[in-house]
Amino acid sequence: MSFSGEMANGKTDVANSGFSSSPEDMSGAEEGKENSSGIEVEASDVSLSLTGDETGTTQAESRDTCSETSGEDKDSDSMDDTGHYSINDENRGNDQSHSEDEEEEEEEEEDEEEEEAVRHRKRAQRKRANRDQDSSDEERALEDWVLSEKTPLPRPRWRALRALRQRQMGSSTRFIYDACGARGFVQRFRLLHGLDGHSGCVNTLHFNQRGTWLASGSDDLKVVVWDWVRRKPVLEFESGHKSNVFQAKFLPNSGDSTLAMCARDGQVRVAELSATHCCKNTKRVAQHKGASHKLALERDSPCTFLSAGEDAVVFTIDLRQDRPASRLVVTKEKEKKVGLYTIYVNPANTYQFAVGGRDQFVRIYDQRKINENVNNGVLKKFCPHHLVTSEAKANITCLVYSHDGSELLASYNDEDIYLFNSSHSDGAEYIKRYKGHRNNATVKGVNFYGPRSEFVVSGSDCGHIFLWEKSSCQIVQFMDGDKGGVVNCLEPHPHLPVLATSGLDYDVKIWLPTAKEPTELNGLKEVIKKNKRERDEDSLHHTDLFDNHMLWFLMHHLRQRGQRRRRRDAGLGAGDADSDDSPSSSDSSDDDEDGPDRVQCIPS
């Protein structure tokens, strides 16, 4: 019995050793499971061998069943009375496996979401990079285009303090002359005031020789002579024209008593002004078969001037003759007439004059050598070489000689402004190029500014006024010049640092260098970029003249036409003093004068 009891106790100890172990002996749930199973088998074998019956097996199975049941009810990590951990190894393994699968799935989903987010970020970064690259490329291309053919600004030649000191000491007799051409003055231009008196777009401006009066002509068919300092009209009168007045100029050395005019109706008229500030009469002295945009004065002659028209004809007009107008030349290119928009007499040689119009060539004629059977009478022609064979049709809207006749400036429609040396041989390339503005919507003017033609000034379709330093081609001034959107006409004062401008607005603007600080050219880069982009788009798509902008012009002018008709019906047209009986126009027809009004920029 004692042996049996010991054996029984031994079985119990062995069994207990199979179901519990100290924490030091536990290395993990799986290891405990394997050890437990092995010990149970050994204890069962020992019990069978010692007792010789099946009692040990039954007891072992009973203990195993009880252990499994109690393991389901107890927490696998709970601690029993002996201080050991009791763990249900199989359930823990299943739970761990299921939990691991869920965690893996969650991790995979998170990884996929993270990868998708990364891909999205990369795509967005690539798009931003592409946009930035495109923008950067555009910026670089614009910078390269603007900076090409430019040179750094030279040091100013005129020093204000030194000039003032010399003037006080009496050693400088040309203070104003030098100051007018100073960059520091140009960079301080600011609007002084406007001159209000027209009811239509102002197309022409011209100072008299002394610079005291300013003449303006408009779509309202009126000409106003201003005392621009006092902001008052000296006189105003009906021009006698039947359509838009394009030019009105004081004839030099006439005592401001003679004003020459031309207009869209093709007429060239002369107004005689009295000392009592009234218009005696206006008379027609020539008639073009198309619109006449410009007149060219001889520097010292009060009686002679030239006119050019869209009919390709250049008239020379001598007011001393019974028949004032005589045809000087018909501009042709390979037997095809070239309509003219602009004409200018060389101030250093009044026999020579230059014309430009509906092709890309600047033509210079000499009145003493015109033989239309030889080179169509042309002395020489200039054109930027890249425009000679260009498919895009380039027109010259305006050209002017420099103060001494050595240079010739030409503004091209939807192109740039080019400077030529007038003494160069036939077909010579340009010497300077001025960029940034846009010349598309109207017959845009261009001019030199300064007593030595130190600067180039032009209007733009963006409504701004651009001033370039001639020598460096750098923009030194940039002003908002027209609320209507287009600046057409720019007239420098003959003696003072004053600039008069006009455009689609119904007023004349006077600019003086009164700003305290030089301009900072704010917004210039964006305006240049916009002008260049619009120009490139138009050149690609070859847009028609009648786009939205031009349709607005057309409607505007049609409204003005109705107003003029009503005014004429009310007896407010040209008075009895107007005379149209000039014999010089006997070979011309007026049949087209009553046709529908056209916008200034649209070819007739």
Curated annotation (Swiss-Prot):
Biased composition (Basic residues): 119-129
Motif residue range(s): Nuclear export signal: 39-50
This protein's record includes keyword Secreted: no
Entry GO terms, CC: cytoplasm; nucleus
Keyword entries, A-Z: Cytoplasm, Nucleus, Repeat, WD repeat
Biased composition (Polar residues): 14-24, 46-60
WD repeats: 197-236, 240-281, 287-327, 335-375, 391-430, 438-478, 482-522
Keyword Cell membrane among record annotations: no
Biased composition regions of type Basic and acidic residues, renumbered to the chain: 61-99, 130-141
Acidic residues composition-biased segments: 100-116
UniProt-annotated stretches for the region Disordered: 1-141, 564-604
Subcellular location: Nucleus; Cytoplasm
InterPro entries: DCAF8, WD40/YVTN_repeat-like_dom_sf, WD40_repeat_dom_sf, WD40_rpt
Family from the record: Belongs to the WD repeat DCAF8 family.
Designated name of the protein: DDB1- and CUL4-associated factor 8
The species this protein was found in: Xenopus tropicalis (Western clawed frog)
Gene it is expressed from: dcaf8
